[in-house]
Structure formats: C-alpha cells, structure tokens
A protein has these predicted regions:
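Intrinsically disordered, low-complexity serine/threonine- and proline-rich regulatory segments
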Residues: 1-15, 98
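Amphipathic alpha-helical dimerization/coiled-coil segments
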Residues: 4, 92-116
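N-terminal helix-turn-helix DNA-binding core of bacterial DNA-binding proteins
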Residues: 11-54
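Conserved amphipathic alpha-helical interaction elements at protein-protein interfaces in regulatory
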Residues: 42, 46, 61-64, 104, ...
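Short, hydrophobic-biased segments on the C-terminal half of alpha helices
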Residues: 56-60
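Beta-hairpin "wing" of winged helix-turn-helix
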Residues: 63-76, 82
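Basic, amphipathic "hinge/linker" alpha-helix immediately C-terminal to the N-terminal HTH DNA-binding motif
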Residues: 75-95
C-alpha cells in the first residue's frame, strides 16, 4: 500500500506532454485507439493530430504507469481504454498546473500593456 502511494505521488508530480494530456482527456470515457485519435483532433480543432505509432506507444506507457487501463478487447481485436482513478488525479493536477501557467502569462502580458 505504502509503495503504491509513493508511486502515484511521483506520477502526479510528473509533467505530461501535450499528447499524454489529450489522451487522458479523451479517456474520461472508454474509447478505442482510432476514436481517441479522432476525438483529440476534434477537441483541439485539428491543432493536434496523432499518428497510430505515437498513440499506441503512449497508450502502453500510460497503461504501465496505471494512469489508464485496457478495459476490453472486442472480437475483431480492437482494444478499448479508460482513465483510472490515479490517471484522473494526474489529469486534475495537470489541468490546475496549466491553468496557473496561463493565468501567470495573462497577468504579465496585461501588466506590460498587452490586452488578454
């Protein structure tokens, strides 16, 4: 139990790449690989496109970290994934971190005469 706690604390302090961030967001509901790619493109207004190679490498990494879980494999071998409780904590932490960064940026720009 103690070992698992320290592991998740370490994970929470890790900064996510943009790709990992969007994968975690997309897995708030269960999705398969192709649906994840499509959802990320939609969510980011096509500013983030992810190829299958990148996606599946990151899905493996996120599974190993126990931030996501492979939930099922269908008859046609399509794998589905969903975020775990640990992954949700990591995501909440990351959203808060990115929000603070944006707020800092807007404040400094405003102080220097730029309109937000």
């Amino acid at each position: 139990e103690v070992e698992n706690m320290s592991k998740s604390n370490t994970m929470e302090s890790a900064q996510l790449t943009d790709a990992m961030y969007y994968i975690l967001l997309s897995l708030m509901i269960e999705r398969h690989g192709y649906a994840i790619m499509k959802y990320i493109e939609e969510l980011s207004n096509q500013s983030i496109t992810m190829g299958p190679g990148t996606l599946y490498t990151l899905l493996k990494k996120l599974c190993r970290a126990e931030w996501i879980l492979q939930t099922s494999v269908t008859a046609d071998r399509t794998k589905k994934y969903q975020i775990t409780d640990t992954g949700r904590q990591v995501l909440l932490h990351e959203v808060a971190r990115r929000k603070r960064m944006v707020e800092d940026g807007l404040r400094i720009l405003e102080e220097n005469g730029y309109e937000g």
